[in-house]
Amino acid sequence: MRSRIAQYGAFTRDRLYEYLPDQEPREYLYDLVAAYPQRSSSMLRPSLLIASARAFGAQASDALNTAVAIELMHNAMLVHDDIEDISELRRGAPSLHRRAGVPLAVNAGDALGFLCFQPLLDNVATLGPFLTLKILEEALETMFQAVEGQAWEL
């Protein structure tokens, strides 16, 4: 099972890189946007999503865009959480706000959050509009639950 989870994580990471913009302003935005996704991580959330989809009879490729969206949003929340908690490190390297300052880190975190919507919308091509909207509804509900939980923690 571990090898399968690792495979799903690698599958997700490869697709995620396709959604990271390679354009200007690199130094002040897009290099920062890519910083957390490029760091080593377990990719547990997207891997479990793909494994769950497979358990219900879907192909891994059917769940891939949603897995990418989850990982992008997770990284966005990590950027903001590190600022809120004044964390020095993330995944063995300086946290983004320590590396680039709070304003640029907030902006990069926002961009990561916005980027998550494109793979969700790209689901229309493979899953159709009805299922895509259901997934989007669930994703939005989960995002709100996460920020509400963070509000309680703060």
Q: Which residues make up each language-model segment?
A:
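Mg2+-dependent prenyl diphosphate-binding active-site environment of isoprenoid biosynthetic enzymes
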Residues: 23-154
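N-terminal amphipathic/basic leader segments beginning at the initiator methionine
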Residues: 1-20
